[in-house]
Amino acid sequence: MSDFFIRLYLDEDVNVMIADLLKASGFDSLTARDAGRLSASDEEQLAYAVSQKRTLVTHNRTDFEELTQLYFHTEQMHYGVIFAVRRPPQEIAQRLLVILNQVTADEMENQVRYI
């Protein structure tokens, strides 16, 4: 069965206000804080996002680029990773809304996006 809407998981470095703004627009956004995963490693954060069928949003490009490459080379799937440059929360939320309104969850599988 295909999934239409992307469900987001924001790691601990991403401002929780972004999740609130996305929820106000009707999108499913979960923060590491709300999931009780603030002390989890990057590997654990991505594994959790995968277990929940969520696209990970992070500012940590260096480490998560390595992890997505590892997933690719070991043929592990993920539900997408979105790298966000540090900007005001409203601007990041707006950029995420563009993706959420134009890309399906199925299209986001194993993809990396930069905003």
Where are these regions (language model features)?
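Short catalytic-loop micro-motif centered on adjacent basic/acidic residues
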Residues: T31-A32, L56, F83
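Conserved BB-loop
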Residues: D28-A40
